[in-house]
């Protein structure tokens, strides 16, 4: 299996001995040894995946990289975070998924209003199986644990990804204090309940709700 490691905080190095990985198209910045690159349609999920992604708007263009040596990946100087999966599922925005083991399965799932509040579509990308994945964030991501006793509220623009058995609810932060100018200015939050981990970035995207 390919070995993922960070070269600094913004470059992913993947050591391969005949292995293969799936990476965001155009993310390769350097390599040594012998590598072969092949563009994959539909996020590497075949014809069905391509049709699904076109219908859902959750576009993801990936390439397969296979060979012997080390390949280096980066995406616009974003911070890179490694996620080790052991049979569970990772939920991540397609734009934040940099690279995965080739054996990991990707797909799409419905997110409803949570995705719309982020300025994204109503669907998000899933990564499932056993292996490693690399995701990007604007600034070093913070990994926050959610338990049944301690749910978590996250600004939609700061959300990157999550794992575990979590339920999501979009809740409004608008109340009387907001209208009189004493509120937080955060129109919506995502409430996570259950057991799992949430990856949060220290930089907010522009969201539909914005600031009130």
Where is each model-derived feature located?
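Phosphate/adenylate-binding glycine loop and adjacent helical scaffold
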Residues: 1-212
